[in-house]
Amino acid sequence: MNLEMMQNSCVNFAFGGLLTAMLVYWSSLAFPRISGLNKLAALITLLVNIALALTLSSRWFANGYFPLSNLYESLLFLAWGLTFVHLFIESKTKSRLIGAVSIPVAMFVTAFASLALPIEMQKASPLVPALKSNWLMMHVSIMMISYSILILGSLLSILFLIITRGQDINLKGSSVGTGSYTVKSLDSNPSFAFSNPSGIVQEQSNMLINSTRMNLLESIDNLSYRIIGLGFPLLTIGIVAGAVWANEAWGSYWSWDPKETWALITWLIFAAYLHCRITKSWQGKRPAILASVGFLVVWICYLGVNFLGKGLHSYGWLA
């Protein structure tokens, strides 16, 4: 078996494994009393992560440069990053929600890379002169890892909005689900709610929200905040590294290239998210909306700009 066949087998296994892991994660949420489902899904995800790592490593060995020079390699690295970040965060939080929201995205990315891209775009090609630099590994890998983390954090914010169904629930308690909160209904003024000894929340508009659901919302909100807080510094480092590399390659730190512009927009959105959470104590719906916008902007920055085929970052992608 040559390297190309081995790579194809690993990618096919990764897609099948992600599909299986997604179904197992969803089953663990639907049937929480069945023990072992979450561990089984995590094991499958770990095997997928290893398969993707083998694919990228073999391309690195065969071609002699870090495998982030075209769209196919970039997509596989993003899928690897999503599974790696997911496994790391899940090991720290023991949350079943992480895999349920991240694995479908990783599966879609892997499917797009292996099924949608033509064969000629999946093959490695010689590097253009500007990419023959050690900055390739540092800048691009850090940016891709930051995208993986920010995508995962934003997905949790989207999940928060789905669960609340448009209700403006401003959390006031701690991240473990204690304290009070405010519910703003569509046809009445905001009303104050508090928890009674039985654990059932009462409020003036007679809207009852189960305390377990509130614990879930507070956990999702806090986890999203922490994950985005982890990804933002990496995004900053990646942008700075790219500016230094651009100065070495083209003699300018910033050229307002489409990719650079959208990277800046991405940075500003998540900077605003963290600013509002830290200085204005935003919780709940408002920061979730901001993070959801950030989710879309990350994809525009990563994929959308490359479909234009313009700018300094268009080589090796969809030019």
UniProtKB/Swiss-Prot annotation:
Subcellular location: Plastid, Chloroplast thylakoid membrane
Keyword annotations: Chloroplast, Cytochrome c-type biogenesis, Membrane, Plastid, Thylakoid, Transmembrane, Transmembrane helix
Major location category of this protein: plastid
MF (Gene Ontology): heme binding
UniProt keyword Transmembrane present: yes
Membrane topology: Multi-pass membrane protein
The UniProt record lists the keyword Glycosyltransferase: no
Any single GO CC term annotated in Swiss-Prot or TrEMBL for this entry: plasma membrane
InterPro entries registered for this protein in UniProt: Cyt_c_assembly (IPR002541), Cyt_c_biogenesis_CcsA (IPR017562), Cyt_c_biogenesis_CcsA/CcmC (IPR045062)
Gene Ontology BP terms: cytochrome complex assembly
NCBIfam families, alphabetized: cytochr_II_ccsB
UniProt xrefs under PANTHER family: CYTOCHROME B_B6 PROTEIN-RELATED, HEME EXPORTER PROTEIN C
Protein name: Cytochrome c biogenesis protein CcsA
Organism of origin: Porphyra purpurea (Red seaweed)
Lineage of origin: Eukaryota, Rhodophyta, Bangiophyceae, Bangiales, Bangiaceae
Gene: ccsA
